[in-house]
Amino acid sequence: MFEASDVMELFPSCLWLHKVSDSSKINEGLMRAVEEMRAAGEGNTRSSGKVWMSPTNLLEYDAFLPLSEFIIPAADQALGFMRYKFDHFYISECWANMNGTGEIHPRHSHPNCFLSGVYYVQTPKGCGAIVFHDPRAQAAVLSPQFEEITLQNSDRHYLQPDEGMLIMFPSWLEH
């Protein structure tokens, strides 16, 4: 019937998943620094009182410099994978979020950025997944029943994080 058949992935949305070496040691120092910032009243708390966000300049603090030691190589790897030509890049912002039980962040993207990332310092039992949404608006015009939900037919992907996990993704990808 066919001489040849193939599947071509068109406009893929890539995630780069990393498990950071010696993350428990790094996480201990990061958590201590975050707790000190929060106790000092730095950052913002949402009206519910269960969500806290640090200032966005964490890499200006010595305690957070270990982050750049693995974020920069991960970004370099992602840019290389996409075959972009670049001489240098920089991290424009870096912040910490702490969510109370049952709290979530509203669906969002990161405008005026190229790559974004999430690093997990703590993932308590029962913590929520990060949810990535299909960026193709027209993909949802018809939703047939599925034999099985796969990456190819779903309009969102739930990724359960682990401590020490770094996820890099295009900044336009809503999560």
Predicted segments, located by residue:
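Non-heme Fe(II)/2-oxoglutarate
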Residues: 1-87, 104
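A broadly conserved detector of short glycine/acidic/proline-rich loop/turn motifs that flank catalytic sites
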Residues: 22, 136, 173
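Short, surface-exposed recognition loops or helix-turn segments adjacent to catalytic cores
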Residues: 89-90, 133
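A short glycine-rich, His/Asp/Glu-containing loop-to-beta-strand
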Residues: 90-96
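Catalytic core of non-heme Fe(II) oxygenases with the double-stranded beta-helix
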Residues: 96-168
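Histidine-centered metal-chelating micro-motifs
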Residues: 103-104, 173-175
